[in-house]
Each structure stands twice: as structure tokens, then as C-alpha cells.
Amino acid sequence: MTLVDVRTPDPKRFIPGATGDWEIVIGLEVHAQVLSNSKLFSGASTTFGNAPNSNVSLVDAAMPGMLPVINEECVKQAVRTGLGLKAKINNRSIFDRKNYFYPDLPQGYQISQFKDPIVGEGTITISLGPDRQGNFEDIEIGIERLHLEQDAGKSMHDQHPTMSFVDLNRSGVALMEIVSKPDMRSSDEAKGYLTKLRSIVRYLGTCDGNMDEGSMRADVNVSVRRPGEGFGTRCEIKNVNSIRFVGQAIEYEARRQVAILEDGGVIDQETRLFDPGKGETRSMRSKEDAHDYRYFPDPDLLPLEFDDAFVEALKVDLPELPDDKKARFVADLGLSVYDASILVSEKAIADYYEAVAAGRDAKTAANWVINDLLGALNKFGKDIETTPVSPDQLGGIIDLIKAETISGKIAKDLFEIVWNEGGNPAEIVEARGMKQVTDTGAIEKAVDDIIAANPDQVEKVKAKPTLAGWFVGQVMKATGGKANPQAVQALVKAKLGIEDE
């Protein structure tokens, strides 16, 4: 594969060294576990967390005479992912044997795809920002290829003081290896790319993206160079299992390589691992090249072939993807690019928002989901799937505000009650006497009392009418936040002789 440099050097991406600026070049190889009930070449279950060696067929264990049979659903999932990446779908692809020895690889080789992958070149667009002016920077990252392959088993070294064990539950599970082009120039870009890729496969339903369970992990290729020069020698950091760790690994590895080069040394092409505890990478082994694996077509598998109709049938059923959904939220619902970007970042968040916004003001719904719901989820370490406030409950709170049954301040208190205790918002308001005070007589008395008690403040307002907000706040405080804010403001202005602008 010939690497092509498509990025113009950008000074704001450079990292400073003792002898001048350096540029990082990053490419990612992401292994995404295919969402399917059975493995790539056997009928064994793919359920995560089962007892060791309980999801193993004779094919997975490489028993003599056992032949692989392709799982059609895994093929469909790979094609769906390729379509979601705007990539070329190859109607003919070939499975190869990648030969290497490892205890948890019972066949002595991995069935993968080398020269003829199922998916060719594609693109992902990421957005970085916003900057101080509120602008976003869109960057297009190239996809080199996507191919199907088997996962290996798992070596277990913590079960016995003197022995290691092998769990083959993962052996033969279908993986999509999604290989980017070396188009990223900072850790933020790499994190943005991985975040966007995870979002896309989750929208498509082709991978759950749960990095903590190992169903998505990244091999990170990092090199450094002087701006404008050719590619440097790269090192590959294997099996990084969180987006945050990807960023940390890149930052450390780039600094390590710069220090070596500035000291007059050379970078060895090698495979490294990232130690999250120490925040550093360390050497594992010298980096293999393709010829070291002695690829050749698997004689037990015919070439994988399908026609255009097969692809089109999958294409028509694709869901709306993040970029299209964001564009619709901006164009049809009038949301800002910033708000739309947050809401489409995860399919579950977008689905939640659309349920809340149905039949309601889109911007009001967005404000509540982003500021109140997501803020609370972040504060208490929860995610959208485990939120204690359902879309119906949040929608009910918004309805009560619109009907002027409660004020904005009371709505915040109501949200907290629903979060902690659950329940129907309207019934809670009724039972706890939280309804907004709309009786103008009662509000007028409260305004009169505040004005009478603060003659000095009245004089200040006459000199500076914008200070009238102080009186509004005092009245709201005196009424426990139950007074209608608009009615309070109108009465305060009338009593103080302030004309509307």
C-alpha cells in the first residue's frame, strides 16, 4: 500500500521541540466486533460474559476436518458499515490465512482478508470545536479499507500462580478491521475520528462500540516529522481500549519520538503497548510486515461474491446517520450547529431528544436535554440508557412550563424530584402545591411589599431602570418561585414607572 499525504501542514497542529516544530502523523486500525448472534465461520454464540470456553464449536477449536462456513449476517453487517462510511463495496473479496503462532489461536493462522477486502476506500468527516468564535472545523479523514476477520481467543494469566489458561469464547468472533489513512495530525483529531466512527457503527447497529468490553479497540500508528517532509518511521500501539487512552498514548508516543530524533537517534519500527497507569508506551516487539505473515488465499473458502442488488437491498434500509440527522436538526428544527452536534453524538441521545421534542418546541426541548438531563447524567456518572428521567417525564415538565402551570425555577425543582423519586410531573405539582401563582392580586401585594421595604433601591432604579430586575428577583424569592415571572416583571415596571423599550 502506497501512503499518500493529503493534508497541508497546519502550524496550529505542530508540537514544539528543542530544535523546532514537529508534525504528528496518525493512522488508526480499529477492530470492531460485528453485532451478530453467531461467529464468523461457526454457529457458536457471541454472547459476552459467559463462562470460559462455553461459546466454542469444533470449528472455533480447530478440530481436524472442521470446515468454516461464512455467516451471511456478518457479511451484511460489513456491507452496511461500508455504506455508512461512504465507501466502495467490493462485490468480490477473498479470505486469506494470516499465519502466526499464539497460544489462543488454535488454528495456527487467522482467517482475514488481505489484497481483496470486502470494503474499499471511504471517508469520515469529523468536526472539531467550537473555537472562541463559536466556529467548527470540519476535517475529512480517509478510510483505506474495511475487511472481515476472526478474533483470537484470550490468554488468562491471573487464574493460577504457575499456569496460564486459554478461553476460546472469543475465538472466531467476527471483527471488522477498519483502517484509516494517515490523515490525522493531532490527538484531538484521532479522538474525534474514533468517537465519530463509534457513533456511526452504533447508529447502523453493526457494532455496539463498547470499548470496555473489548468489542471495539484501536491499534494506533504514530510517527513524527518536520513539517513538509515525508512520512517518518511509525510505531504501532496495540489494542488501546478507550478514546481517552488513545489521546494519551499519542501524546506520549509523539514526545518520545521527538526526543529520540532531537538527540540524534533513529526510530525503530516496532509494536508497543500503552500502560494507562503510567501514561506511557513501552516496546513489545519489532513490527512485522505483511510478508512475515505469509498470506495466501484460504483453500477452505471460496471467494465471497454478491451482486449490486444485494448491496442495494441493504442500502435502502440504512437508518439516518449522524451527519444527516445533524443537518436535519439545523435546517428543519432551527437548532444551532453546536446543539445539534451534541444531540446526534450518540444514537440513544438523538432518539431521546426526538421523543421529547415530538409536538413541542424543538429549541426548548434541546435546552432541557442538553443542559439539564445531560448535565445531570454527567454529574452522577450515568448514561442515557440508565437515565431515571424518561422522555415522557421530561416532556411533561416542558408541557407544564408552556401551560404556565409552573415557572422555570419550579421546573428545575420538579426535574430534581423526578430524577430522585420518579413519578408523574403533573401529579407531583398538584400534590406538592407547586403550581405557579397567577392571581394578579397576590402578585401585586408582593410587589407592593418589596417596593415599600426598599425605598433606596427605588431611587436607584429611577436613575438606572435596568436595575428593576432586582425587584423581580426579590418578588420571585418572596413567592417561593411560584409567581408568574412575566406578570411580576410587568407589575414591577408599572409600579416603578418604567416604560417598555
From Swiss-Prot:
GO terms for biological process: glutaminyl-tRNAGln biosynthesis via transamidation; translation. The keyword Ligase applies. InterPro entries: Asn/Gln-tRNA_amidoTrfase_suB/E (IPR017959), Asn/Gln-tRNA_Trfase_suB/E_cat (IPR006075), Asn/Gln_amidotransferase (IPR018027), Asn/Gln_tRNA_amidoTrase-B-like (IPR003789), GatB (IPR004413), GatB_C_1 (IPR042114), GatB_Yqey_C_2 (IPR023168), Gln-tRNA_amidoTrfase_suB_CS (IPR017958). GO terms for molecular function: asparaginyl-tRNA synthase (glutamine-hydrolyzing) activity; ATP binding; glutaminyl-tRNA synthase (glutamine-hydrolyzing) activity. Its EC number is 6.3.5.-. It comes from the Bacteria. Keywords: ATP-binding, Ligase, Nucleotide-binding, Protein biosynthesis. It catalyses: L-glutamyl-tRNA(Gln) + L-glutamine + ATP + H2O = L-glutaminyl-tRNA(Gln) + L-glutamate + ADP + phosphate + H(+); L-aspartyl-tRNA(Asn) + L-glutamine + ATP + H2O = L-asparaginyl-tRNA(Asn) + L-glutamate + ADP + phosphate + 2 H(+). It is an enzyme of class 6 (ligase). PANTHER family: GLUTAMYL-TRNA GLN AMIDOTRANSFERASE SUBUNIT B MITOCHONDRIAL AND PROKARYOTIC PET112-RELATED (PTHR11659), GLUTAMYL-TRNA(GLN) AMIDOTRANSFERASE SUBUNIT B, MITOCHONDRIAL (PTHR11659:SF0). Heterotrimer of A, B and C subunits. Belongs to the GatB/GatE family. GatB subfamily. Allows the formation of correctly charged Asn-tRNA(Asn) or Gln-tRNA(Gln) through the transamidation of misacylated Asp-tRNA(Asn) or Glu-tRNA(Gln) in organisms which lack either or both of asparaginyl-tRNA or glutaminyl-tRNA synthetases. The reaction takes place in the presence of glutamine and ATP through an activated phospho-Asp-tRNA(Asn) or phospho-Glu-tRNA(Gln). This is Aspartyl/glutamyl-tRNA(Asn/Gln) amidotransferase subunit B. It comes from Agrobacterium fabrum (strain C58 / ATCC 33970) (Agrobacterium tumefaciens (strain C58)).
